[in-house]
C-alpha cells in the first residue's frame, strides 16, 4: 500500500528536525570530532558528501553514550507525537545497499537489493526530479529507511549505468561477505546459511575428530590449509562435481598470522554450532585454567583468560562454552580473576560479557558462512586472492 502523501511530506520535516538537532550545542563536540575523522586531510567536501555524512551521523554513528543521534533525539523529545515517533523508530534500522532499478513510476522506484536479494518499493520526499536519472537497469548505491509499507531514500545516492554491472556485482559480493548481517535480512539466505554452517561443522568434526582441536604453533598453518582443501573436496562432491584432470590445487588460506604467535604457543580451533569456527591463540593455557587439577588457576592462565575477556576479536561464545562444560571451575576462575568471591557465572556472567564485549554479547547469532547467489558468487574474489 503506497505511503500517505502527508506522511511523505512529514518525513521531510522530521529529517530537517533531526539535522537541526545533530547540529545543536549538546552534540557539537562529537560532531566536530566525526567531521575531522571523516574529512581531515581532504579538500572541502562537496554537497553530496556532506548530505551523506550527516545522514550516516544521524542514523548510524554511535555517540559516546552508545546511542545514535536518532535514538538520543527520541529520548530527548518525550512529547513527540506518536505518529512521528513511530516513523522515527522505524529509521533506527536503515538499509545500506547496492540496488538494481527494476521499475520507475513518478517518484517511486521498485529496486532489487543485490546484497540481500530482496525487492523494495522506494519513494523520495524530494519529488520526481530526484529519481529522474534512476532508470530501469541502472544501479544505485543508497540508504533506505522504512516509511509505512514502503521505503524512503535517505542521504545521498550514487547512480551507476547498466554497463557497470560487473563492477557493481563484485562490490555487492564483497559487502555480503564482509557485512553478512546485511545479506541475512533475507530469511531464505539466513536459513541456507545455517544449513551450510551445520554441514561445514560436520566436515570439521570428520576431519579433526572433534569440534575442538588444539594444535601446536608449528603445525597450525599446515593443518588449516589441509582442512581448507578438505572443505573444497567435500563441497565439490556434494555438488556432484569432480576435480578436473591436471587441475591446479586450491589457493591456500592466508595463515601468515601464525608466525606472529610466540614460540611454543598453542592454537585452538573450536567449531561452535551457533558461533561458527573460532581460532584462539594460547588455547591450551586458557583451557587449563578451567580444567586444571589445582584449586586455583596459575597466574599465567589468569593472564590469558583476562586477555580473552578484554580482546575485542574473541567471541563471548568461548566463555559461555566453558560455563556450560565446566560451571564450577568457571565460577572459581572469575572469582580469582576479578577478586570477587561472590561471583557466579549464572548470576553475573552475562553482565560481565556485556561490560567487555557488549556489541557481540547482545548480538543475535548469525551464521559465519554466507551463501551467495549465482551472480554474486561469479563475481566474488575471496580475500587474499
Specify the residue positions occupied by each region the protein language model found.
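A structured, charge-rich N-terminal accessory region that forms the first stable segment of a protein
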Residues: 1-82
Amino acid at each position: 500500500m503506497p505511503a500517505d502523501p502527508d506522511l511523505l511530506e512529514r518525513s521531510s520535516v522530521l529529517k530537517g528536525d533531526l539535522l537541526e538537532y545533530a547540529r545543536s550545542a549538546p552534540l557539537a563536540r562529537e560532531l566536530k570530532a566525526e567531521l575531522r575523522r571523516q574529512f581531515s586531510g581532504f579538500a572541502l567536501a562537496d554537497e553530496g558528501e556532506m548530505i551523506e555524512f550527516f545522514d550516516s551521523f544521524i542514523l548510524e554513528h554511535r555517540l559516546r553514550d552508545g546511542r545514535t543521534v536518532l535514538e538520543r533525539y527520541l529520548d530527548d523529545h518525550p512529547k513527540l507525537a506518536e505518529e512521528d515517533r513511530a516513523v522515527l523508530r522505524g529509521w533506527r534500522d536503515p538499509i545500506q545497499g547496492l540496488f538494481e532499478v527494476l521499475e520507475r513510476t513518478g517518484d517511486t522506484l521498485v529496486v532489487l537489493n543485490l546484497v540481500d536479494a530482496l525487492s523494495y518499493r522506494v519513494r523520495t520526499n524530494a519529488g520526481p526530479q530526484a529519481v529522474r536519472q534512476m532508470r530501469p537497469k541502472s544501479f544505485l548505491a543508497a540508504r533506505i529507511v522504512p516509511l509505512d509499507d514502503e521505503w524512503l531514500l535517505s542521504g545521498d545516492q550514487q547512480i551507476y549505468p547498466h554497463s557497470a554491472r560487473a563492477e557493481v556485482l563484485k562490490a555487492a559480493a564483497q559487502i555480503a561477505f564482509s557485512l553478512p548481517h546485511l545479506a541475512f535480512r533475507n530469511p531464505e539466505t539466513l536459513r541456507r546459511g545455517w544449513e551450510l554452517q551445520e554441514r561445514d561443522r560436520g566436515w570439521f568434526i570428520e576431519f579433526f575428530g572433534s569440534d575442538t582441536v588444539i594444535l601446536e604453533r608449528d603445525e597450525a598453518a599446515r593443518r588449516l590449509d589441509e582442512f581448507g582443501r578438505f572443505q573444497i573436496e567435500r563441497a565439490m562432491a556434494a555438488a556432484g562435481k569432480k576435480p578436473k584432470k591436471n587441475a591446479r590445487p586450491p589457493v591456500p588460506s592466508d595463515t601468515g598470522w601464525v608466525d606472529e604467535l610466540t614460540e611454543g604457543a598453542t592454537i585452538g580451533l573450536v567449531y561452535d554450532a551457533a558461533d561458527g569456527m573460532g581460532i584462539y591463540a594460547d588455547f591450551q593455557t586458557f583451557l587449563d585454567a578451567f580444567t586444571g587439577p589445582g584449586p586455583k588457576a596459575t597466574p599465567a592462565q589468569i593472564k590469558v583468560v583476562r586477555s580473552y575477556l578484554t580482546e575485542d576479536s574473541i567471541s563471548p561464545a568461548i566463555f559461555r562454552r566453558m560455563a556450560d562444560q565446566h560451571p564450577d571451575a568457571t565460577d572459581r576462575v572469575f572469582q580469582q580473576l576479578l577478586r570477587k568471591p561472590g561471583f557466579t557465572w549464572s548470576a553475573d556472567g552475562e553482565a560481565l560479557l556485556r561490560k567487555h564485549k557488549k556489541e557481540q554479547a547482545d548480538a543475535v547469532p548469525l551464521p559465519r558462512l554466507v551463501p551467495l547467489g549465482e551472480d554474486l558468487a561469479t563475481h566474488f574474489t575471496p580475500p587474499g586472492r
